[in-house]
Amino acid sequence: MKRAVVVFSGGQDSTTCLAQARHQYDEVHCVTFDYGQRHRAEIDVARELALKLGARAHKVLDVTLLNELAVSSLTRDSIPVPDYEPNADGIPNTFVPGRNILFLTLAAIYAYQVKAEAVITGVCETDFSGYPDCRDEFVKALNHAVNLGMAKDIRFETPLMWIDKAETWALADYWGQLDLVREETLTCYNGIKGDGCGHCAACNLRANGLNHYLSNKAAVMAAMKQKTGLR
């Protein structure tokens, strides 16, 4: 039996990954992390979506220690979430240091226990947000270290790594989940479901991608299929 673990936030990217995993694996587990994030509503959204999309199990892990160590606008109400700035340089204040290091490592430990062959994460380098822990180089390096540390061959899969946000919408549509992803996921840094606040970087990237996909469906779908190998 083929098993996978999805690092699952209930946002657009991880929900699209879950939708795909349900078609590619016999058994899919979801792991969601409570780190005291500003947008904690995502945990309830993740619970609902994991059930709706047929995950075998859904674990919510308490990692609130990360909140104490990592200062970010996503972990501190006193730090405002910035509006989208198209030409902003450097690492944004929404970056949570160590988040993906911790999430992927814990997901791999869980995968070890349930005998899953893959950990799936929705990180993406194409629409690079300034987060160093979303890079392909980082994921591969951590995957190598985790496998050495557990003497186990667990594969970190990044199905969105080389597709842009419009193509991610196309992927959701390919698996028949465009409306669900559009209406029921929570991507917004300010914790607003669906289309979100419309001002933060996450909402801007999501909306621009959706508009581009809806305006150029055939071309974007074809590009997504070419990059992912889907038919």
Swiss-Prot record:
Note accompanying the cofactor annotation: Binds 1 zinc ion per subunit.
A GO molecular function held by the record: ligase activity, forming carbon-nitrogen bonds
Annotated positions binding ATP: 8-18
Entry keywords, A to Z: ATP-binding, Ligase, Metal-binding, Nucleotide-binding, Queuosine biosynthesis, Zinc
Enzyme Commission identifier(s): 6.3.4.20
Keyword check for Metal-binding: yes
Residues holding Zn(2+): 188, 197, 200, 203
Cofactor: Zn(2+)
InterPro entries the UniProt entry points to: QueC, Rossmann-like_a/b/a_fold
Catalysed conversion reaction: 7-carboxy-7-deazaguanine + NH4(+) + ATP = 7-cyano-7-deazaguanine + ADP + phosphate + H2O + H(+)
Region forming the signal peptide: none
GO biological process: queuosine biosynthetic process
Pathway assigned in UniProt: Purine metabolism; 7-cyano-7-deazaguanine biosynthesis
Family: Belongs to the QueC family.
NCBIfam families: 7-cyano-7-deazaguanine synthase QueC (TIGR00364), PRK11106.1 (NF008317)
Function: Catalyzes the ATP-dependent conversion of 7-carboxy-7-deazaguanine (CDG) to 7-cyano-7-deazaguanine (preQ(0)).
Annotated protein name in UniProt: 7-cyano-7-deazaguanine synthase
Organism in which the protein naturally occurs: Salmonella paratyphi C (strain RKS4594)
Gene that encodes the chain: queC
